[in-house]
Each structure stands twice: as structure tokens, then as C-alpha cells.
From Swiss-Prot:
The gene is C2orf42. PANTHER family: C2ORF42 HOMOLOG (PTHR13518:SF1), PUTATIVE TREBLE-CLEF ZINC-FINGER C2ORF42 FAMILY MEMBER (PTHR13518). One of its GO terms (cellular component) is nucleoplasm. Disulfide bonds: none annotated. This is Uncharacterized protein C2orf42. The lineage of its organism: Eukaryota, Metazoa, Chordata, Craniata, Vertebrata. It comes from the Eukaryota.
Length: 574
């Protein structure tokens, strides 16, 4: 009777389902408990068998911490009520509050935050919102960090933009306030900018979006928060695209500096009709490295091989050949002469072959750059004596070729004077050619070598006796900006007092009327038979103290201080 009673309890609409199956469930191989096929582990708590491991949860991009290179905590937070591509900035900090008690004054530190969304900012100033807004809460719980992008000076120099744009990008990139470009999401980036009323933190958001539809051509859009309700489209007119903002060029330069990013954003890099000109790199024949005859064949082969690789990856052939050429030159042509290795293999009593002792132009130019570094010392004033070098005519021809890079013709000197030397040797009539360089990027391009890049700023620390010593801090080079700022953020360096010297070239202050030149003087045939000339380099440098321009103060200890000796005592012998 019991089976019949159970059958009568089944509803009529379930009577024709047929025999039950095990679809969607499975037995646990350990305890035999039935579990769903999508389960990760056995639901029997005493068993605990794990069937498969779930996918690792990706970090949320609701809030991303920006690398600032300082104690300033800035976050890029998504505005949920506007869409995935709308983001704002949130600043977190610690504020001190004093409380007066009977025992005295107590100073407490409270964590505070400031949201830069206009509505939240207005509500906070009016005192309408008592608690923290949703954007500050997201920033407090943030665990993701932005990815800094590399910016190579070689790509910046090769980019066909105005000199003012290049110099502004270079100044922003070399400031110790974090990397110039940081990647927040797949399409959104954060770019440094000059602090203003609209962008008081000195950062803004940009986005590169590509929309693909089957009916029309792919549409590429660039948005920048420095412009109001405007976007740059790939099919826009030339008048609109001619007004590219400086942040667009900064992002394009960062994309071109990395091979993976260049391939990802190749549509923006290769598109020429939208107003973005191709990044033309100077040919090797016009570059100063071509003066080294031993490098020509190796560099040309490596350049051809690099072009084949780039074309196979469907990238713009004019985008990154300079990187390949320069890297191959570093590996092959621009090595030190083989003299050093051959000398190590020589026996102690073996004579040195004088024909193998040579000095290349690259090695000599590296010594000039090192001499400039030594001269930019914080302990001395910013107007040093001219640096004098006696070099062959061929070396100066190579240097003049570097001075003329970027122009179709050889750059003529700013002034040519003839003078008669009577009070010093050698006597006679000589000609002096003078070049005035007023662009810091061009000075760096002239003096940069793979072994000794020109340092525009130098850091120092002050000793107890008032002297100054060079401070070897983590590198802030633009070439390795991603690695540098990542290391600084993880292991901050203690800097009690920031003392720096900087090379004065161009307009270095807002009220400066005439640009400060970097002067190169050349007097040929000082030694006419040997074809040796005299090269003079004149420059000025300034002093920075905690980020502000400081006047030079001579704090060196006087050299004529009398030595304090212990009084002599009489020693008697028995």
C-alpha cells in the first residue's frame, strides 16, 4: 500500500516525466555525496574534497592608485552614475587636530579625503554631506595601482611636433612627481599636466577608444579632460585635428616607446590623415654615430633586420627603427675598442702595440659629458669657467653634425669673429665660430651617448661641515621610468633635504626675457700641422632647494684656518 500511496501524491502534471536521471549532479569520489556539476568542492563539510579551483578574482578597477613619487595619495575612481569611461580624482591624506584638555594639548591625526567631482566638492564645501562620499570610500579600499609607461627621449626627439611641445613634455617627464603617463584601464590613462584651477592636482584623464562596426570603418576617438565636450575622431577635419593637445602627444610618445603598446595602439600611431604625422627617425647616415667607421656596416645590417621584424608584426616601419638601431649600436658598434680585452690577454713582458691604442668620438664625447657633470656641483656658483678641449678637426666635424640634426642643411654659427692673439701662445690671427643653443632637448641630443647620458639635474646631500656630496638616488631617467617609479613607491628613499643643481638652458623662470644659451665655441688650427683646434663650452646652472630655486651661498670652509696642534711636551730619558 505504501508505494501506491506515494504514487498518488505526485501531481498529475509530473506523472509523465519518466525515469529520474543524474543529469547536472555527480557523486563525490571520496564520500559519495551528490553535488552539482558546477560545484567547486563537496558540500559535505566533513569531506571537503576540492573538485576544481576557481578563477582568480581580478583586482577591481573601480579605484586605482596613481604613482606620484611623493607622500601625496591620489586615486583615479570611476563615477558609477555616469558610465565606465568617466573617472574622477580623489586625494587622501592625514590631518592633525588639537584637543585642549585639563592635562594639556593633545594632537590627534585623522584620515581625511577630498573628492574632486564637482557635485561632491560643492556639497562638501557647503557642509551638506556629513559622511564620506562613495568615491572616497572606493579610494580607501583601493588595492590596484596604475602602470607607469616608459617615455624614451629618442622617440620624443624624432616626433614631428613643435619644439615648444617637445620641451614642455620633456619638462613634465623629468619632474620628480611620478611618471608622465600611467595606464589605469585598457583605454584610460592618467597624464601629468600643469596645475591649474580645473586640474589642481596636476593630473588629468585621457582615453583612446576604438569602435568597430560591420557597416562602417573602425572609428578611433581620443578624449582629454582638458577639452570640454570635444573628442578627436579619426575622420575629423584637418582644422579640428590640428589642435592636438600636448597630452595626446605625450600618450603617443609613450605608446611608441614600448613595442607591445605600439602594436596595441598601432591604429592611432599609423593614422596619418588625422593630423598625426608619422614619427620619422633620423637616418643613420645623418646621425652622429655614423662618424664611427667601424660601426657603419654592423649598424646597417641590424637596421635592415629590424625593419623586417617590424613589417612582419604589421607595425609602422617608421615607428621604432631608432630603438633597434641604437640597441644594436650599443651591442656592436659602440663598444669600447678591442684594446682593453687584448691587453688582458697579453703577457706581462709583451710590448703594447701603439697602433691599437685609439680613442673613438663616442668615448671622447662621454668624457665631455662627464666633465659637465663634475662642473654642476652644488658647492660652487652657477657660472663656471669655460671648459676647454683640444681635439682634432674630425671630432669637431662629428660634433657639428650633431648640432645640425633636425635641419635639412648644416647649421651655421650664430657669430664668426676674427681675432689676433698677442699676449698668449700660440700667437697669430685666428677665427672663432660660436653656436648658441637655447633648447635643452637639443643640448641633450648633442651630448648624449649610450655610455654617458647627459644629466640635466644632479642631486646632492649636505655634510655636517657644510660641504656637499653627490647623492646617488634611484634613477629618474625617462628611458626607464616604469621600473624607477615602481621601485620608489615600494621602497621609499629617505630624503631629509632635497638639494639639486639644474642646467640652465632657455627660459628657466617666468619673468626671464632673454633665454640662457648653451655656448659652443670652436677655434680651428690652433696646432695647424696636427689639425688640432680649441673647443670651448660655456654654460650656467642653477640651484634647487626643496623644489624651489635657491640663491648660491658660499658655505665652504675657509682653507686658511690655522691647524690646532697639541702643545709639545718634554720627554726625559733616564
Amino acid at each position: 500500500m505504501e508505494p501506491n500511496s506515494l504514487r498518488t501524491k505526485v501531481p498529475a502534471f509530473l506523472s509523465d516525466l519518466g525515469k529520474a536521471t543524474l543529469r547536472g549532479i555527480r557523486k563525490c569520489p571520496r564520500c559519495g555525496t551528490y553535488n552539482g556539476t558546477r560545484g567547486l568542492s563537496c558540500k559535505n563539510k566533513t569531506c571537503g574534497t576540492i573538485f576544481r579551483y576557481g578563477a582568480r578574482k581580478q583586482p577591481s578597477v573601480e579605484a586605482v592608485k596613481i604613482i606620484t613619487g611623493s607622500d601625496l595619495q591620489v586615486y583615479s575612481v570611476r563615477q558609477r552614475d555616469r558610465g565606465p569611461d568617466y573617472r574622477c580624482f580623489v586625494e587622501l591624506g592625514v590631518s592633525e587636530t588639537t584637543i585642549q584638555t585639563v592635562d594639556g594639548t593633545i594632537i590627534t591625526q585623522l584620515s581625511s579625503g577630498r573628492c574632486y567631482v564637482p557635485s561632491c566638492l560643492k556639497a562638501a564645501t557647503q557642509g551638506v554631506v556629513e559622511n564620506q562620499c562613495q568615491h572616497i570610500k572606493l579610494a580607501v579600499n583601493c588595492q590596484a595601482e596604475a602602470t607607469p609607461l616608459t617615455l624614451k627621449s629618442s622617440v620624443l626627439n624624432a616626433m614631428q611636433a613643435s619644439p615648444e611641445t617637445k620641451q614642455t613634455i620633456w619638462q613634465l617627464a623629468t619632474e620628480p612627481t611620478g611618471p608622465l603617463v600611467q595606464r589605469i584601464t585598457k583605454n584610460i590613462l592618467v597624464v601629468k599636466c600643469k596645475a591649474s584651477q580645473k586640474h589642481s592636482l596636476g593630473y588629468l584623464h585621457t582615453s583612446f577608444v576604438q569602435k568597430v562596426s560591420g557597416k562602417s570603418l573602425p572609428e578611433r576617438r581620443f578624449f582629454c579632460s582638458c577639452q570640454t565636450l570635444k573628442s578627436h575622431k579619426s575622420n575629423a577635419s584637418k582644422d579640428e585635428t590640428a589642435q592636438r593637445c600636448i597630452h595626446f602627444f605625450a600618450c603617443i610618445c609613450a605608446f611608441a616607446s614600448d613595442e607591445t603598446l605600439a602594436q596595441e595602439f598601432s591604429d592611432f600611431l599609423n593614422f596619418d590623415s588625422s593630423g598625426l604625422k608619422e614619427i620619422i627617425v633620423p637616418q643613420l647616415g645623418c646621425h652622429s654615430e655614423s662618424t664611427v667607421s667601424a660601426c657603419e656596416s654592423t649598424a646597417s645590417k641590424s637596421k635592415k633586420r629590424r625593419k623586417d621584424e617590424v613589417s612582419g608584426a604589421q607595425m609602422n616601419s617608421s615607428l621604432l627603427p631608432q630603438d633597434a638601431v641604437s640597441s644594436n649600436l650599443r651591442k656592436s658598434g659602440l663598444k669600447k675598442p678591442v684594446v682593453a680585452s687584448s691587453l688582458k690577454r697579453q703577457a706581462c713582458g709583451q710590448l703594447l702595440d701603439e697602433a691599437q691604442v685609439t680613442l673613438s668620438f663616442q668615448d671622447w664625447l662621454a668624457s665631455v659629458t662627464e666633465r659637465i657633470h663634475q662642473t654642476m656641483h652644488y658647492q660652487f656658483d652657477g657660472k663656471p669657467e669655460p671648459l676647454v678641449f683640444h681635439i682634432p678637426q674630425s671630432f669637431f666635424d662629428a660634433l657639428q653634425q650633431r648640432i645640425s640634426i633636425g635641419s635639412a642643411k648644416k647649421r651655421l654659427p650664430n657669430s664668426t669673429t676674427a681675432f689676433v692673439r698677442k699676449d698668449a701662445l700660440p700667437l697669430g690671427t685666428f677665427s672663432k665660430y660660436t653656436w648658441h643653443i637655447t633648447n635643452i632637448l637639443q643640448v641633450k641630443q648633442i651630448l648624449d651617448t649610450p655610455e654617458m647620458p647627459l644629466e640635466i639635474t644632479r642631486s646632492f646631500i649636505q655634510n655636517r661641515d657644510g660641504t656637499y656630496e653627490l647623492f646617488k638616488c634611484p634613477k629618474v631617467e625617462v628611458e626607464s621610468i616604469a621600473e624607477t617609479y615602481g621601485r620608489i613607491e615600494k621602497q621609499p628613499v629617505l630624503r631629509p633635504l632635497e638639494l639639486k643643481t639644474f642646467l640652465k638652458v632657455g627660459n628657466t623662470s617666468p619673468d626671464q626675457k632673454e633665454p640662457t644659451p648653451f655656448i659652443i665655441e670652436w677655434i680651428p688650427d690652433i696646432l695647424p700641422q696636427s689639425k688640432i683646434g680649441e673647443l670651448r663650452i660655456k654654460f650656467e646652472y642653477g640651484h634647487h632647494r626643496n623644489g624651489h630655486v635657491a640663491e648660491y651661498q658660499d658655505q665652504r670652509p675657509p682653507l686658511d684656518q690655522p691647524l690646532e696642534l697639541a702643545p709639545l711636551t718634554t720627554i726625559t730619558f733616564p
